[in-house]
């Protein structure tokens, strides 16, 4: 039987304890023991994440641990064991043990029980167990449930701790006891502790009280209220949600025991903190320092007492005595108000005195008291600011007079050769001083006196000898001209007006020493040299007679150097100059005095100028065009002489322009078989130029033009040469492509085929005859013309498939027909097709007509027999029957024969049979057509190749007498298909 112990886990409340909290596992349903087969949902809740997130679950059972992960914080389980969870970045939770019991009776209890909770214990039984309504605590009967399954603890407290179980009876067997559940009631929060910002505050200072506690993690959402007390008196307004209480000022009367209470809402659980003593501290007052004897003349050796006293009594006070801020002595006294020290006066005891009193709450100083010890002055000492015997004119000298001993104030007097100079009074130690600038008259003996009321004391005399330093020298040139040429001789003169001998002169050029000379008296020295270009610059001289050199004003010397022959450099952004590039002409004379004016030339024509004020080089920029090819030079001039550079040649390459592609053919319209010339030419561009020719972006070939200009490429045209053409020009800089040019190669029309189409077997006056003309080859648009006996009937245009012309037949329409096809490249004429329109004679009446009709019927019968025989023979020969099922209905209509004239297609061999029934004057000729296909037959439109009508054609009507109107017959030299 499993004993389950509920663990207490605390969470921080009000920020008192900072630590990383563990997540908590919550159960649904809330029981730790359930029957096997039931499910329990575990929820992992953390206190630093507020939305479900990826969670790890650890399940340990019988020594084995299984790790699972869920995308959220929920896991549904059915297995017994110990479960823990871990959210991202959190520690592992405390373990929760679940028991999926196979017992017939179980007692269910919640995972955690806290003081003040309403607790339900549920006794559940399987079907074969009957409850006896008894629940036990620590094996003692606790209650009879009277058939109820739940036992309620309305307000849990520590007395409810114990082991609980319930009992029942198995049917026809024995008593059954449930598992034992151990209940341990936990406090929802820890006992509070009172904290104070200070337990020994100084009187008048504020204090903050804090009631610290921790809520259990399972009860972290339970609100707490707080109440603060001093002794048994409530502070403030009573219960508050804040764990802090502010006392704005603490006084001595506020000392006492302080404590606090924390309670859950609605005050079901209340806990008191321990009591803490707060002692208000009173700091010492400012002490008073007194001297004794008072107002006495304090000579050296007199005994003086200093007394320091406060106004309040303290358990212990530390007194300290100070002289000019330096500690002298200290005394610690108990329950006394003051302390004293005594000493005999010396000269060092003069000054300010004060004391401090400290009772542990900070030292408080007294006001300062001054003590003056009277001492006669000693002989003063006179000092100069410089120990040197030689003092130069203009220097600043300080005389310092000081008596080493003597009471203040002291009156000091300075003297020069017995004459009083100046007097000064000193109220502090250190003496006095006077300063002045020396002249030659200040040479002589000096002394000083000191007097503090007991008679003046005189110092020893000090001698002062004033030396005159040299004045600023003046540097001059031998020539007043500012411009001096290379090779000339120049003399520098350096001279001073005043100064004690001996004087050292030094000459400098740009701070570099040139020459020096020493003279025993005031005057000047000179220095000469021949000029070179390097002598340009600033010159000065110095004069020194032992008191530091004096420097003259700077004199500038400019040595003018003629310019040398300049060097011209051409700079372009690439190895070869190209139109559009920025050309920099760089001209530089290696030697020559500035400023230098540079001129730039192209083919001796001035481009421009540029000045170099400081010497060196100059540049001139050009944006290149084709005209900039040629010779360049530059010139340098600094006013003395002009120098011309060598000539440099520049060749400017011109990128090819976009080429133009043109077609050159023998006629306006390109025709199959023509020789086409493709001419490509770039109007601009440096040679050589390589031309590429393209048809539908496929390279046809390339041709080079070494001297520029255009290039041509020839083609013998076929129908495949229709399409888009372009060309490309490239002279090594950048290839340029022409615009696309479309070429359409025209095909001349072939010889057309003329076909006559009538609605019946015999053409009769009034029938609608269709003349169809078609050229099997030829570029559209094709114009078809129709002719009857070479007389134009009409014309039709057609892009494809031929054209037709309809005629309503009359007797005059018999004769020869032809057609012509023309697409602008030459007309082609079809072969002639003959059309006969005939009829019976006028005396076709009575018996004769009947005889003729009978004869015609006989002939028709013979013709039908011949047709059947011909079809049978055709089948035996493997030819397609006339009634081919693949034909369309229009193709099988025997009433719409079609007549063609197809040149070189089939050779027809007619067999003629005359039919002249009863000797009448109308003779019919029967034509049997024998078709012999030639190997070189020309293909035609499939619709013209179908078999239409009977293979027997009445090709000619011979009239023996005057024709009469009647049925019409058609004859054609074209084969019947």
Curated annotation (Swiss-Prot):
It is a single-pass type I membrane protein. It is found in: Cell membrane. Residues 23-101, 188-271, 287-374, 380-463, 473-556, 566-651, 659-744, 752-834 form the Ig-like C2-type domain. A motif (ITIM motif 4) lies at residues 952-957. Residues 1-15 form the signal peptide. A motif (ITIM motif 1) lies at residues 897-902. Glycans are attached at residue 383. GO terms for molecular function: coreceptor activity; transmembrane signaling receptor activity. Expressed in marginal zone B-cells, immunoblasts, tonsillar germinal center centrocytes and in the intraepithelial and interfollicular regions of the tonsil. Expressed in many lymphoma cell lines and on hairy cell leukemia cells. Isoform 1, isoform 3, isoform 4 and isoform 5 are detected in lymph node, spleen, bone marrow, and small intestine with preponderance of isoform 3. Expressed in mature and memory B-cells and down-regulated in germinal center cells (at protein level). Disulfide bonds join 44-85, 211-260, 308-355, 401-448, 494-541, 587-634, 680-727, 773-819. Contains 2 copies of a cytoplasmic motif that is referred to as the immunoreceptor tyrosine-based inhibitor motif (ITIM). It is linked to A chromosomal aberration involving FCRL5 has been found in cell lines with 1q21 abnormalities derived from Burkitt lymphoma. Duplication dup(1)(q21q32). Interacts with CR2. Interacts with CD19. Plays an important role in B-cell response to antigen that acts both as a negative or positive coreceptor. Inhibits B-cell receptor (BCR) signaling in the absence of CR2 stimulation but engagement with CR2 and the BCR lead to a superior calcium response compared to CR2 and BCR costimulation. May be involved in B-cell development and differentiation in peripheral lymphoid organs and may be useful markers of B-cell stages. May have an immunoregulatory role in marginal zone B-cells. May play a role in fertilization. This is Fc receptor-like protein 5. It comes from Homo sapiens (Human). The lineage of its organism: Eukaryota, Metazoa, Chordata, Craniata, Vertebrata.
């Amino acid at each position: 039987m499993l004993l389950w112990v509920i663990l207490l886990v605390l969470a921080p409340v009000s920020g008192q304890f900072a630590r990383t909290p563990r997540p908590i596992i919550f159960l649904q349903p809330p029981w730790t023991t359930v029957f096997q087969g039931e499910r329990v949902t575990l929820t992992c809740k953390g206190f630093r994440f507020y939305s479900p997130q990826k969670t790890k679950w650890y399940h340990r059972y019988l020594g084995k641990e299984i790790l699972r992960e869920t995308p959220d914080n929920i896991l549904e389980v059915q297995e017994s064991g110990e479960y823990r969870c871990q959210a991202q970045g959190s520690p592992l939770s405390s373990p929760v043990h679940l028991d999926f019991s196979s017992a017939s009776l179980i007692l269910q209890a919640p995972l955690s029980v806290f003081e003040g909770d309403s607790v339900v214990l549920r006794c559940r039984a399987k079907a074969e167990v009957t409850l006896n309504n008894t629940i036990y605590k620590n094996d003692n009967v606790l209650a009879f449930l009277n058939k109820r399954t739940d036992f309620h603890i309305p307000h849990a407290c520590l007395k409810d701790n114990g082991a609980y179980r319930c009992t029942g009876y198995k049917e026809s067997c024995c008593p059954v006891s449930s598992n034992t559940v151990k209940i341990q009631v936990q406090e929802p929060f820890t006992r509070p502790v009172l904290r104070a910002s200070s337990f020994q505050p100084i009187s008048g200072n504020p204090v903050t009280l804090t009631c610290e506690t921790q809520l259990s993690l399972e009860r972290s959402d339970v609100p707490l209220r707080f109440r603060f007390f001093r002794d048994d008196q409530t502070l403030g307004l009573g219960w508050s949600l804040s764990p802090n209480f502010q006392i704005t000022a603490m006084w001595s009367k506020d000392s006492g025991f302080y404590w606090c209470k924390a309670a859950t809402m609605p005050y079901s659980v209340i806990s008191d903190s321990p009591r803490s003593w707060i002692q208000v501290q009173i700091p010492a007052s400012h002490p008073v320092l007194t001297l004794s004897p008072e107002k006495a003349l304090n000579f050296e050796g007199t005994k003086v007492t200093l007394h320091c006293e406060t106004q309040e009594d303290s358990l212990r006070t530390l007194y300290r005595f100070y002289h000019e801020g330096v500690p002298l002595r200290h005394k610690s006294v108990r329950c006394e108000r003051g302390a004293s020290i005594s000493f005999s006066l010396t000269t060092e005891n003069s000054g300010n005195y004060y004391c401090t009193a400290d009772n542990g709450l900070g030292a408080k100083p007294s006001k300062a008291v001054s003590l003056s010890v009277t001492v006669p002055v000693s002989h003063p000492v006179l000092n100069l600011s410089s120990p040197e015997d030689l003092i130069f004119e203009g220097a600043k000298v300080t005389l310092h007079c000081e008596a080493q001993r003597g009471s203040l104030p002291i009156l000091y007097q300075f003297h020069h050769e017995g004459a009083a100079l100046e007097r000064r009074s000193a109220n502090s130690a250190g003496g006095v001083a006077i300063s002045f600038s020396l002249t030659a008259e200040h040479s002589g003996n000096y002394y000083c006196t000191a007097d503090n009321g007991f008679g003046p004391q005189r110092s020893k005399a000090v001698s002062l000898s004033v030396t005159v330093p040299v004045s600023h020298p003046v540097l001059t040139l031998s020539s007043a001209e500012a411009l001096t040429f290379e090779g000339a001789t120049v003399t520098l003169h350096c001279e001073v007006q005043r100064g004690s001998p001996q004087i050292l002169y030094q000459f400098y050029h740009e701070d570099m020493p040139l020459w020096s000379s020493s003279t025993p008296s005031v005057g000047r020295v000179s220095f000469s040299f021949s000029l070179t270009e390097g002598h340009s610059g600033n010159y000065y001289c110095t004069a020194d007679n032992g008191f530091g050199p004096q420097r003259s004003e700077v004199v500038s010397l400019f040595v003018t150097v003629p310019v040398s022959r300049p060097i011209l450099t051409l700079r372009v952004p690439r190895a070869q100059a190209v139109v559009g590039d920025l050309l920099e002409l760089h001209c530089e004379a290696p030697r020559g005095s500035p400023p230098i004016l540079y001129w730039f030339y192209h083919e001796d024509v001035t481009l421009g100028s540029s000045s170099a004020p400081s010497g060196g080089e100059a540049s001139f920029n050009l944006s290149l065009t084709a005209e900039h090819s040629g010779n360049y030079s530059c010139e340098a001039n600094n006013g003395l002489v002009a120098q011309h550079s060598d000539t440099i040649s520049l060749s400017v390459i011109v990128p090819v322009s976009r080429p133009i592609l043109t077609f050159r053919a023998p006629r306006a319209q390109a025709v199959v078989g023509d020789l086409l010339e493709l001419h490509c030419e770039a109007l601009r561009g440096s040679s050589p130029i390589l031309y590429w020719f393209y048809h539908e972006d496929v390279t046809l070939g390339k041709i080079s033009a070494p001297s520029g200009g255009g290039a041509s490429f020839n083609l013998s045209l076929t129908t495949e040469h229709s399409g888009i053409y372009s060309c490309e020009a490239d002279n090594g800089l950048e290839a340029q492509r022409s615009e696309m040019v479309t070429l359409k190669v025209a095909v001349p029309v072939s010889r057309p085929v003329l076909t006559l189409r009538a609605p019946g077997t015999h053409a009769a006056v009034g029938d609608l005859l269709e003349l169809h003309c078609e050229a099997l080859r030829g570029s559209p648009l094709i114009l078809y013309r129709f002719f009857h006996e070479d007389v134009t009937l009409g014309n039709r245009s057609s892009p494809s498939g031929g054209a037709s012309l309809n005629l309503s037949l009359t007797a005059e329409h018999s004769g020869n027909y032809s057609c012509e096809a023309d697409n602008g490249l030459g007309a082609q004429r079809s072969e002639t097709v003959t059309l006969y329109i005939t009829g019976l004679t006028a005396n076709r009446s009575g018996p004769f007509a009947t005889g003729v009709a009978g004869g015609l019927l006989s002939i028709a019968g013979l013709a039908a027999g011949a047709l059947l025989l011909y079809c049978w023979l055709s089948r035996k020969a493997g030819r397609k029957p006339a009634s081919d099922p693949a034909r369309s209905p229009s193709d099988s209509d025997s009433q719409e024969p079609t007549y063609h004239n197809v040149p070189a297609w089939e050779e027809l061999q007619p067999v003629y049979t005359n039919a002249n029934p009863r000797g009448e004057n109308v003779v019919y000729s029967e034509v049997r057509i024998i078709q012999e296909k030639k190997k070189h037959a020309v293909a035609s439109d499939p619709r013209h190749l179908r078999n239409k009508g009977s293979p027997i054609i009445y090709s000619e009507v011979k009239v023996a007498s005057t024709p009469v109107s009647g049925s019409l017959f058609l004859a054609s030299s074209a084969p019947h298909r």
